Amino acid sequence: MKNSLSIAVVFTILLFGLLFIPLAGEVENTFVFFLGRFHPIILHLPIGALIVLFLMEIINDFRPDLNLNSACNILLWFSVISIIPTIILGFLLASSGNYNDELLNTHKWLGWFTALICIWLVVLRQKKSSNKPNSVTRFYKMFLLVNVSLLLFAGHYGGS
């Protein structure tokens, strides 16, 4: 629990640091643009992992005898580990300034909040009791639903 909290704090600070990357073509660095072009390639990793996690949590509610907790933990950690470079590359790609400002801004904030919630889901998941439902379990499930919803909207605006 303590390790996941420390990691969540570090990743949250990293996310806040990304907000200082200038957008709208203020950075003129070909290497930055090159790296940013990998955003559309790797973004499918956290998307797939979060959606599969969401489905596995639903299955786990209806069939606790399957005991999918370990698999859910692995998927959630994989989501966090893959969402961080996805967000970084997205900010680098956005810095090229070749995008509709309104769509880019909406996509940026939806993606940023998706990453932030994903990071803190790890803490909630480790704190919740797998044996009996409690308030942390309800918060975890509610935030997972919110996260998947944000993910769907972020993907919609990013693909536009």
Language-model region placement:
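Polytopic transmembrane helical bundles with strong interfacial aromatic enrichment
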Residues: 1-160
